[in-house]
A protein has these predicted regions:
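Histidine/acidic residue-rich metal-binding segments in metalloenzymes
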Residues: 1-33, 42-58, 72-92, 109-118
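Catalytic or ion-translocation cores adjacent to nucleophile or general acid/base/metal-coordination motifs
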Residues: 4-14, 63, 100-104, 126, ...
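Beta-strand segments within the central parallel beta-sheet cores of soluble alpha/beta enzyme folds
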Residues: 33-36, 132
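Short acidic/histidine-rich active-site segments
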Residues: 35-39, 63, 86-105
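Flexible loop/turn segments at secondary-structure boundaries
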Residues: 41-47, 67-71, 98-102
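Mid-to-C-terminal alpha-helical segments outside catalytic/metal-binding sites
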Residues: 44, 86-87, 104-150
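A generic structural motif
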Residues: 59-70, 91-92, 124-133
Length: 150
Protein backbone atom coordinates (compact mmCIF):
# COMPACT_ATOMS: atom_id res chain seq x y z
CA UNK A 1 0.00 0.00 0.00
CA UNK A 2 2.88 2.36 -0.31
CA UNK A 3 5.91 3.02 -2.42
CA UNK A 4 9.13 1.45 -1.18
CA UNK A 5 7.74 0.04 2.05
CA UNK A 6 7.38 -3.62 1.08
CA UNK A 7 3.60 -3.45 1.09
CA UNK A 8 3.11 -4.58 -2.49
CA UNK A 9 -0.56 -5.54 -2.75
CA UNK A 10 -1.74 -6.83 -6.15
CA UNK A 11 -4.39 -4.88 -8.00
CA UNK A 12 -6.36 -6.12 -10.99
CA UNK A 13 -4.87 -4.93 -14.27
CA UNK A 14 -5.68 -5.36 -17.95
CA UNK A 15 -3.10 -5.39 -20.74
CA UNK A 16 -4.59 -6.93 -23.89
CA UNK A 17 -7.09 -4.24 -24.90
CA UNK A 18 -5.03 -1.38 -23.53
CA UNK A 19 -1.87 -2.37 -25.39
CA UNK A 20 -3.53 -3.41 -28.64
CA UNK A 21 -2.95 -0.16 -30.57
CA UNK A 22 0.72 -0.10 -29.55
CA UNK A 23 1.27 -3.80 -30.26
CA UNK A 24 -0.61 -3.74 -33.57
CA UNK A 25 1.72 -0.95 -34.68
CA UNK A 26 5.02 -2.08 -33.17
CA UNK A 27 4.68 -5.50 -31.50
CA UNK A 28 6.54 -7.31 -34.28
CA UNK A 29 8.73 -4.39 -35.35
CA UNK A 30 12.47 -4.90 -35.45
CA UNK A 31 14.07 -3.61 -32.25
CA UNK A 32 10.84 -3.09 -30.29
CA UNK A 33 10.85 -4.56 -26.76
CA UNK A 34 8.09 -4.23 -24.17
CA UNK A 35 8.35 -5.92 -20.78
CA UNK A 36 5.13 -5.58 -18.76
CA UNK A 37 5.23 -6.43 -15.05
CA UNK A 38 2.39 -7.12 -12.62
CA UNK A 39 1.60 -8.80 -9.33
CA UNK A 40 -1.82 -9.83 -10.66
CA UNK A 41 -1.30 -13.58 -11.07
CA UNK A 42 -4.51 -14.02 -13.07
CA UNK A 43 -3.02 -11.95 -15.90
CA UNK A 44 0.06 -14.14 -16.53
CA UNK A 45 -1.62 -16.98 -18.41
CA UNK A 46 -4.68 -15.06 -19.65
CA UNK A 47 -2.90 -12.04 -21.16
CA UNK A 48 0.86 -11.65 -20.80
CA UNK A 49 2.05 -15.10 -21.85
CA UNK A 50 -0.16 -15.17 -24.99
CA UNK A 51 0.98 -11.63 -25.89
CA UNK A 52 4.63 -12.66 -25.51
CA UNK A 53 3.97 -15.79 -27.53
CA UNK A 54 2.42 -13.84 -30.40
CA UNK A 55 4.37 -10.57 -30.52
CA UNK A 56 8.09 -10.75 -31.20
CA UNK A 57 8.78 -7.67 -29.09
CA UNK A 58 6.86 -8.62 -25.92
CA UNK A 59 8.54 -10.32 -22.97
CA UNK A 60 6.79 -11.23 -19.71
CA UNK A 61 8.31 -9.34 -16.80
CA UNK A 62 9.47 -11.72 -14.08
CA UNK A 63 8.18 -10.13 -10.87
CA UNK A 64 10.73 -11.58 -8.44
CA UNK A 65 11.67 -8.31 -6.79
CA UNK A 66 8.20 -8.05 -5.27
CA UNK A 67 6.99 -11.65 -5.40
CA UNK A 68 9.61 -13.54 -3.46
CA UNK A 69 7.40 -16.38 -2.25
CA UNK A 70 8.44 -19.77 -3.71
CA UNK A 71 4.96 -21.09 -4.52
CA UNK A 72 4.06 -17.86 -6.34
CA UNK A 73 7.30 -18.10 -8.34
CA UNK A 74 6.45 -21.66 -9.41
CA UNK A 75 2.90 -20.63 -10.33
CA UNK A 76 4.34 -17.84 -12.48
CA UNK A 77 6.55 -20.28 -14.41
CA UNK A 78 3.68 -22.74 -14.85
CA UNK A 79 1.33 -19.97 -16.03
CA UNK A 80 3.69 -18.43 -18.58
CA UNK A 81 5.94 -21.14 -20.00
CA UNK A 82 3.36 -22.83 -22.23
CA UNK A 83 2.69 -19.72 -24.32
CA UNK A 84 5.69 -17.50 -23.78
CA UNK A 85 8.40 -20.13 -23.18
CA UNK A 86 11.16 -19.44 -20.69
CA UNK A 87 12.95 -17.41 -23.36
CA UNK A 88 10.24 -14.75 -23.67
CA UNK A 89 10.53 -13.60 -20.06
CA UNK A 90 12.74 -10.90 -18.59
CA UNK A 91 14.79 -13.26 -16.46
CA UNK A 92 15.55 -12.42 -12.85
CA UNK A 93 16.02 -8.76 -12.07
CA UNK A 94 16.24 -6.95 -8.77
CA UNK A 95 16.48 -3.50 -7.30
CA UNK A 96 18.88 -2.17 -4.71
CA UNK A 97 16.35 -0.96 -2.12
CA UNK A 98 16.94 -4.16 -0.17
CA UNK A 99 20.62 -4.47 -0.99
CA UNK A 100 21.46 -6.95 1.78
CA UNK A 101 18.68 -9.32 0.71
CA UNK A 102 19.67 -9.49 -2.96
CA UNK A 103 21.85 -12.64 -2.65
CA UNK A 104 19.05 -14.48 -0.83
CA UNK A 105 16.46 -13.34 -3.37
CA UNK A 106 18.64 -14.42 -6.27
CA UNK A 107 19.20 -17.74 -4.51
CA UNK A 108 15.50 -18.45 -4.07
CA UNK A 109 14.81 -17.45 -7.68
CA UNK A 110 17.49 -19.85 -8.94
CA UNK A 111 16.18 -22.66 -6.72
CA UNK A 112 12.59 -22.13 -7.87
CA UNK A 113 13.62 -22.03 -11.53
CA UNK A 114 15.70 -25.19 -11.00
CA UNK A 115 12.73 -26.87 -9.33
CA UNK A 116 10.51 -25.95 -12.28
CA UNK A 117 13.10 -27.23 -14.76
CA UNK A 118 13.52 -30.45 -12.74
CA UNK A 119 9.77 -31.03 -13.04
CA UNK A 120 10.01 -30.65 -16.82
CA UNK A 121 12.88 -33.16 -16.89
CA UNK A 122 11.00 -35.68 -14.73
CA UNK A 123 7.97 -35.32 -17.02
CA UNK A 124 10.26 -35.94 -20.05
CA UNK A 125 9.33 -32.57 -21.53
CA UNK A 126 12.97 -31.47 -21.72
CA UNK A 127 16.28 -33.28 -21.31
CA UNK A 128 18.69 -32.78 -18.44
CA UNK A 129 21.13 -31.12 -20.85
CA UNK A 130 18.38 -28.70 -21.89
CA UNK A 131 17.60 -27.96 -18.22
CA UNK A 132 21.25 -27.14 -17.49
CA UNK A 133 21.47 -24.86 -20.55
CA UNK A 134 18.19 -23.12 -19.73
CA UNK A 135 19.21 -22.60 -16.09
CA UNK A 136 22.32 -20.78 -17.28
CA UNK A 137 20.35 -18.78 -19.83
CA UNK A 138 17.84 -17.62 -17.20
CA UNK A 139 20.53 -15.71 -15.30
CA UNK A 140 22.49 -14.28 -18.23
CA UNK A 141 21.46 -14.39 -21.89
CA UNK A 142 17.68 -14.15 -21.32
CA UNK A 143 17.69 -10.91 -19.30
CA UNK A 144 20.45 -9.41 -21.45
CA UNK A 145 18.40 -10.06 -24.61
CA UNK A 146 15.11 -8.85 -23.09
CA UNK A 147 16.65 -5.59 -21.90
CA UNK A 148 18.82 -5.21 -25.03
CA UNK A 149 22.08 -5.25 -23.09
CA UNK A 150 23.99 -7.29 -25.70
Amino acid sequence: YGADVGGDIPMAVEFTRSLRPLLDAYGNAEGFHLIPFTMDETVYSRELAPLAGWYRGVYVGVPWWFIDEPDAMLRFRAATTGFATLYKTSGFIDDTRAFCSIPARHGIARRCDSSFLARLVVEHRITMDDAVRISRDLVGPIPRRAFKLD
